[in-house]
Amino acid sequence: MRTITIIRKYGPAALFLAAFTALSGQVTNSKYTDMENLSTKEFPALPYAYDALEPYIDARTMEIHYDRHHRAYFNNYVAALKGTAYENMPIAKVFAEISKAGDALRNNGGGYYNHVFFWRILGKGSAGPSPELSAAIDKSFGSFDKFREAFSNAAKTRFGSGWAWLVLTPDKNLAVGSTPNQDNPLMDISPLKGKPLLTIDVWEHAYYLKYQNKRADYVEAFWNVVNWDEVNRLYREAVK
């Protein structure tokens, strides 16, 4: 009965993940409650089925993106940590010293963290920014529409591969910007600094199967699958 429920509610991919977890123990809890102390012992589970974001992000893209690209970053990050002074260090502290840690930790640690964060802010059915976040958006950008335009432009104009971000800056304002490759706003080398609240992956592997070279179409589709409940929670935690 439980198997039937899983299939009906979440799809076959979720059943596979549940079975994989039970048999191997290699996938951990999908809540990702502590981003600054991500586990290097277990690869985090995707928090929904591969087809959960259809039609905006297709199931095949999600499968390849999560199980190949993201998993490779995790494995390579764990391997790069071994035997270094950073081996038992929380990932946020590694990022704070990433200029000294080297490219292997920068690229793979960034790829691991950024994807976990990306999965958690995606989802369907949330209502939108909370009153508190809406007020902060209005203060920093003038309106939600202006914020959305700024964020979308950061994503569309990032040359080559990278990420666009909404962050809470150290002075408690909201800011939008982008980072190259697998850099993120927690890294000491990033011009954009702050606590991440929202992101979009603009590497071609994130959208090419469905959108080909039309990154702008992918960015516009992204707004249909923002998990505002999680973004609101992140904002509440960040302003404490």
Predicted segments, located by residue:
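Bacterial Sec-dependent N-terminal signal peptides
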Residues: M1-T28
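Feature for soluble, non-membrane regions of globular proteins
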Residues: Q26-K240
